[in-house]
Regions:
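Kelch-like beta-propeller repeat domains
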Residues: 1-172
Length: 172
C-alpha cells in the first residue's frame, strides 16, 4: 500500500472530514505512527514506510497550521510501528510496538517532556498479581486514568492476541 503525509480534521459540527492545509514542511509520508494532543499541539511519533521505521517526533501547531520536527535530548525510542503515544500532562508516553524490519518488540515505557524536549525511560510496574512489566505487545490501546496508564489487548511476539487490561503504575 501507499503511505501519505496529508492531514485531515473531522468537523464535529458538519460531521465531515476537511483537508488541513499547512504552511510548512510536513513529516515524511508514513503509516503505523501514533498521535496525541497536548493543548493546541498535536504530536506524532514513529511509523514506517515499506523500507524504514521512523523514530522522529513532530509537532503540529493547530492554531498556526505549522509542522516542526522536534530536536530532542536523551535516548529516544527506536523506530517502530504498532505502539501507542499517550499524553499525561506535559509528558508523552510511548509504549510497546515493534521495529518493522527486525520485528523487535520493545519492553520499555518511554517518556517525553514537551517542555524540556527530553526523552527518558520510566520503570514499568503493573497492578497484576505477578507484578513486573506487562507482556511485550504491538497493536494495543492505552489511555490514562487517575495517574495510571491503562493498557488493553494487542498482539504478542508469538502471534497470539491479548485480551487483558493491565494497569501500569506510573512511578516518577
Amino acid at each position: 500500500g501507499r503511505c501519505f503525509n496529508d492531514l485531515h480534521w473531522f468537523d464535529l459540527k458538519s460531521l465531515r472530514w476537511q483537508p488541513q492545509l499547512t504552511t510548512s514542511k510536513s513529516p515524511m509520508q508514513r503509516s503505523g505512527h501514533c498521535a496525541c494532543a497536548v493543548d493546541d499541539t498535536m504530536y506524532i511519533f514513529g511509523g514506517n514506510t515499506t523500507k524504514n521505521s521512523f523514530n522522529d517526533l513532530w509537532e503540529f501547531d493547530v492554531l498556526s497550521s505549522v509542522w516542526r520536527q522536534i530536536k530532542t535530548t536523551g535516548k529516544s525510542p527506536s523506530g517502530r510501528v504498532g505502539h501507542t503515544i499517550t499524553a499525561l500532562g506535559p509528558r508523552l508516553l510511548v509504549l510497546g510496538g515493534r521495529e518493522y524490519a527486525t520485528n523487535y518488540f520493545d519492553c520499555h515505557l518511554h517518556s517525553f517532556d514537551v517542555r524540556t524536549r527530553h526523552w527518558s525511560q520510566v520503570p514499568l510496574h503493573t497492578s497484576s498479581p505477578r507484578g513486573g512489566p506487562p507482556p511485550l505487545r504491538t497493536g494495543h490501546c492505552t489511555t490514562v486514568h487517575a495517574g495510571r496508564l491503562l493498557l488493553f489487548g494487542g498482539l504478542r511476539e508469538d502471534g497470539r492476541f491479548l485480551d487483558d487490561i493491565t494497569t501500569v503504575e506510573l512511578i516518577s
